[in-house]
From Swiss-Prot:
SMART domains: ANK. Signal peptide: none annotated. The modification Phosphoserine is found at residues 263, 296. The modification Phosphothreonine is found at residue 272. Belongs to the ANKRD34 family. It comes from Homo sapiens (Human). Keywords: ANK repeat, Cytoplasm, Nucleus, Phosphoprotein, Repeat. Residues 220-249 are annotated as: Disordered. InterPro entries: AN34A/B/C, Ankyrin_rpt, Ankyrin_rpt-contain_sf. This is Ankyrin repeat domain-containing protein 34B.
Length: 514
C-alpha cells in the first residue's frame, strides 16, 4: 500500500486534510474545534505530517504554507513521535527545504533533541545531503553561541552517508571512523601497557588505548590524531621484540638456580687446593660436635680452638658450598659406590690426614693427662679386682707393632668420599688435649681418673671396613660415628674424686709452655 494512502486512511480527519495539503479543509477543521497536536497511532502530529508529506494535486498547497499556518495556530514543533523524531527531524529527513526548516526554527524548534537512535536534526540533514538546509541549521547554532562539529563517515548500503555528531571533540579522518549506529563500549577497548621508557624502538609510539573493531582500510595511514577516541593508531612495522622483559618473566626457578651456581663458581675460583683441603678438614673436625670440659687448666689449646673457629667462620663458606663446587666440577655425576681397591689420591689424602690429625690429638691429650702427678699421688690403692681390670686395660692400651701396621693399612685402604656434616662425634676435654671418643677404640677409664701410662700410639682395633660403608661414605649419606660413653659404667657404684688445689705454680708454667 502506498504511504499516502496509508496515512490518509488512518488517524483523524485533521491529519488526513494536512496530508493532502488541503489548507481550506484544515482551516475549517481547526475552526470547528479540532485539536491541532492530536497524534495518530505512530505518535505523529499534523505538523509532522505536513513536513513529511509529498502529496501534490491541483487543490494542494505548498509545504511551507501549510507549516506556517499550523505554527500560527500554536502547533508544538518539539513534540516527538514514538521513534523520538520531531517535526524538524522529519523535515530534514524528507528534504522539506530550507524555508520549512527556517519556519520551524523561528517557532522554537530545538536542535539539540535526539531520537531513540541518538540522531539529531543535524545528522539527518547531512545524511540527506541537503546543503541549504544544513547551512540554515548551522546558522541557527552559531546564533545561539554553539559550535557544532559534524563528521561524515562511511556510506550506508543504499549509498547515503552515515553521520555522527561530536561535541567538543576534534575531527578525525573519515576513513578510520565507525558507523554512527554502533558506539564504542568499554568492553571493546584494548588496554595496553606502555613499554619501558628507556626503549627507543618504534613500539613506544603506541598509545595506552586501542579499539578492537575499528581496523578499517584507513588503518594504514601515516597520520593519526591523538585526540580521537575511535581511531586506532597505525601499528609500527614488526621488528625484534624488546630485550627489556621483566626478570620474573624470563627467569624461571631453574635459570635462577643456574645463575646462583655460576656466581658460586666465580667466587670459588681463587681458592687454592691447600685452602680447600683445610676447609674440608675444618668442616670434618668442627661441625656440630659437643665439647665437654673436665678441667680448666688448658690455655694454649683453648686459644687454638678459638682460632680454628674464627678461621672457619671468616671464610663465609659452608661445607655444603664446598660439596656443591665439587659436585658441579664433576659434571653432575650420580652417586657411585667406590670399592676398597680403588684409591683416588686426592680424597684418600684428605681422609687419611683427617684421621691422622685425630690420632695425634688423642695421643697429645693422653700424654698430657698422664703428666699430672697430683692425681697419681692422691689416689687410693685399688682392690684386687680393680687392679686386675686396670692391668688388662693397660695391656689393651699398649700398642704392638702388628696392630700399628694394621691400623696404618686400614687408614690407607679406607675409601675416600665426602663425609656427612652430621657426624656427631663428641669431643671430650681432659687436660689440654681435645680428642673424640669412639666405640671403635677400646679405651676405658675408671671414674676417679687414674694415671695412665699410655704409649704415644694407641691401637685402633675393631674397625671393619666393607664396601657398603664405603659406598655410604662416598654418597655423602648420614653415617653416625660410634662413640663410647663419656663416663665408664663403673661410675655409678663409685664416688668421683673431688680435686682441690691439685696444681702447683711450676706445673702451671710447664703446661703453659707445653
Amino acid at each position: 500500500m502506498d504511504e499516502g494512502m496509508e496515512i490518509s486512511s488512518e488517524g483523524n480527519s485533521l491529519i488526513k486534510a494536512v496530508h493532502q495539503s488541503r489548507l481550506r479543509l484544515t482551516r475549517l477543521l481547526l475552526e470547528g474545534g479540532a485539536y491541532i497536536n492530536e497524534s495518530n497511532d505512530r505518535g505523529e502530529t499534523p505538523l509532522m505530517i505536513a513536513c513529511k508529506t509529498k502529496h501534490v494535486d491541483h487543490q494542494s498547497v505548498s509545504k511551507a504554507k501549510m507549516v506556517k499556518y499550523l505554527l500560527e495556530n500554536n502547533a508544538d514543533p518539539n513534540i516527538q513521535d514514538k521513534s523520538g523524531k520531531t517535526a524538524l527531524m522529519h523535515a530534514c529527513l524528507e528534504k522539506a527545504g530550507p524555508e520549512v526548516v527556517s519556519l520551524l526554527l523561528k517557532s522554537g524548534a530545538d536542535l539539540s533533541l535526539q531520537d531513540h537512535s541518538s540522531y539529531s536534526a543535524l545528522v539527518y540533514a547531512i545524511n540527506s545531503e541537503d546543503t541549504e538546509t544544513l547551512k540554515v541549521l548551522l546558522s541557527a547554532c552559531k546564533a545561539k553561541g554553539k559550535e557544532v562539529i559534524i563528521i561524515t563517515t562511511a556510506k550506508l548500503p543504499c549509498g547515503k552517508h552515515t553521520t555522527k555528531q561530536y561535541l567538543n571533540m576534534p575531527p578525525v579522518d573519515i576513513d578510520g571512523c565507525h558507523s554512527p549506529a554502533t558506539c564504542t563500549t568499554p568492553s571493546e577497548i584494548d588496554i595496553k601497557t606502555a613499554s619501558s621508557p628507556l626503549s627507543h624502538s618504534s613500539e613506544t609510539e603506541l598509545t595506552l588505548f586501542g579499539f578492537k573493531d575499528l581496523e578499517l582500510a584507513g588503518s594504514n595511514d601515516d597520520t593519526w590524531d591523538p585526540g580521537s577516541p575511535v581511531r586506532k593508531p597505525a601499528l609500527a612495522p614488526k621488528g625484534p621484540k624488546l630485550p627489556h622483559a621483566p626478570p620474573w618473566v624470563k627467569s624461571p626457578p631453574l635459570l635462577m638456580h643456574q645463575n646462583r651456581v655460576a656466581s658460586l663458581q666465580e667466587e670459588l675460583q681463587d681458592i687454592t687446593p691447600e685452602e680447600e683441603l683445610s676447609y674440608k678438614t675444618n668442616g670434618l673436625a668442627l661441625s656440630k660436635r659437643f665439647i665437654t670440659r673436665h678441667q680448666s687448666i688448658d690455655v694454649k689449646d683453648t686459644a687454638h680452638l678459638l682460632r680454628a673457629f674464627d678461621q672457619a667462620s671468616s671464610r663465609k663458606m659452608s661445607y655444603d658450598e664446598i660439596n656443591c663446587q665439587s659436585y658441579l666440577s664433576e659434571g653432575n655425576q650420580q652417586c657411585i659406590e667406590v670399592p676398597v681397591d680403588q684409591d683416588p689420591d686426592s680424597n684418600q689424602t684428605i681422609f687419611a690426614s683427617t684421621l691422622r690429625s685425630i690420632v695425634q690429638k688423642r695421643n697429645l691429650g693422653a700424654n698430657h693427662y698422664s703428666s699430672d702427678s697430683q692425681l697419681s699421688a692422691g689416689l687410693t690403692p685399688p682392690t684386687s679386682e680393680d687392679g686386675k681390670a686396670l692391668i688388662g686395660k693397660k695391656k689393651i692400651l699398649s700398642p704392638s707393632p702388628s696392630q700399628l701396621s694394621e691400623s696404618k693399612e686400614l687408614l690407607e685402604n679406607i675409601p675416600p668420599g665426602p663425609l656427612s656434616r652430621r657426624n656427631h662425634a663428641v669431643l671430650e676435654r681432659r687436660g689440654s688435649g681435645a680428642f673424640p671418643l669412639d666405640h671403635s677404640v677400646t679405651q676405658t677409664r675408671q671414674g676417679f681418673l687414674p694415671p695412665l701410662n699410655v704409649n704415644s700410639h694407641p691401637p685402633i682395633s675393631d674397625i671393619n671396613v666393607n664396601n657398603k660403608i664405603c659406598s655410604l661414605l662416598s654418597c655423602g649419606q648420614k653415617v653416625l660415628m660410634p662413640t663410647v660413653p663419656i663416663f665408664p659404667k663403673e661410675f655409678k657404684s663409685k664416688k668421683m674424686l673431688l680435686r682441690r688445689q691439685s696444681l702447683q705454680t711450676e706445673q702451671i708454667k710447664q703446661l703453659v709452655n707445653f
